[in-house]
């Protein structure tokens, strides 16, 4: 399937057409509705519908890939209609209330858009920073969040991402080696660092700085964190972290 996807310039909509799924992308009244896949006895193939209101190109691509998953994954044909809201189509993998079919479709979309072998080969000699995240986002037609998460998931370096709304911590994800250092530590519920404020005030640029680790986690300072923060939507900030040095 990756060969076909490359021929489609990594556009899930075009891949869906190759697979025989008609695709309707339109504006719907609610941002909560992301997409759906509809099966009916009158249809030769299921129809995919996607909502483009408030969606980046990368997010829309993920939504359509998710619906393709519902169309081809084993066991998904037992349900005639999948209506997926933003809580179902989850790039960040932190909604534990999602049912298994939605989780399977999310994993399918992630692996289709950012295949492990190809992505690993590209990132192995790159620095984990926004310059490269944005390049890869454009190359793979994905969102900033998904691209950063996949990098963290596959990396052997001490790296992590933090997602904040305003100054409030919402979730974080660390590489295996980073997580080993912090799996028993609680992130601070409110993160009062200039990076986040400056990123919100200056959404067009990436804010860089170095912080002691105790400004992010409830602990005595052990490491220096090199941080890049960027406002990805309104007051939502995604911060890239790697451990710069031991103290």
Regions found by a protein language model. Give the residues of each.
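Active-site hotspot residues in diverse enzymes, especially metal/ion-binding acidic/histidine motifs
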Residues: 1-247
